Curated annotation (Swiss-Prot):
Limits of the KH type-2 domain: 38-106
Compositional bias segments (type: Low complexity): 285-316
Pfam families (alphabetical): KH_2, Ribosomal_S3_C
GO cellular component: cytosolic small ribosomal subunit
GO biological process: translation
Protein name: Small ribosomal subunit protein uS3
Compositional bias per record (Basic residues), positions renumbered to this chain: 222-232
Amino acid sequence: MGQKVNPHGFRLGITSEFTSRWYADKQYKAYVGEDVKIRKMMSKGMERAGISRVDIERTQGRLRVDIHTARPGIVIGRRGAEADRIRGDLEKLTGKQVQLNILEVKNPEIDAQLVAQGVAEQLSSRVSFRRAMRKAMQSAMKSGAKGIRVQCSGRLGGAEMSRSEFYREGRVPLHTLRADIDYGFYEARTNFGRIGVKVWIYKGDIVQSRAEREAQEALLRQQRRERPRRGPRSGSSGTTQGGTDAGRAAARAGDRRGRGGSGGGGGSAEKASAAEKAPAEKPATESAAVEGTPVETPAVTPETTAAPAAVTTAEAQGAPEKAEG
């Protein structure tokens, strides 16, 4: 189904919006006829203006028309003369006050309607249809499109039998409803007849609707403003890689000063920390190594240096026993 239906109508309310926004009960038929006449009038004498689309919005006794064009200077005219003429024609056609807005298309290379119109103009100028299609595809992909498909149908190259040819580059997922796909159609008038040009341009995925995206962006901006700033990190907290060792050393030094000091009353905490730092010392004598007698390590304080290892009573008695043997 996605291969045949118009991509804009297939995605109404999901990724695309209505080009005519109004409500009518009994005058529905008249309003639809007016919209068709307005768009036909816009496209009749404005071939060189590059009009992409025309949005129509109605309120009570008033009409608003938005013209999206790639060349706003042609639509406005010299000192606004052309815009005044268009506004007068619209007021004469509808019998209401008309607000005319002329909007510029920022990136015409990825606008499907403008791309189709450009290919059709080249076909009318007797340019090879393959060359025109490939040139349009290259410019669209360079401008940021994720995929494009161009199709030409008719007496291509002046052939007696009409046919259809298309070229595609990138991805064009027509069945994916969240895909933002732009579609355009234009007819080229040649000496051999009319050639229809269709263009599909894939610009990416749209997960949410427009209102939901705007609400989410506003919420994110508010959260950024209300977020508290983080204070400076201290070295003793041990939260950073460079401050971990320094913080531990400062904590150990404070613990030693609070418990033992230089008077030797530090107890087992100082001995454990000194034993972790100091390398394992060799036994004073060979008998101590054989019997497995532990050798005490002196207490290390920040103010004094370590004293030489003292010989225990068991070691002193073991030396003569070895001599007697």
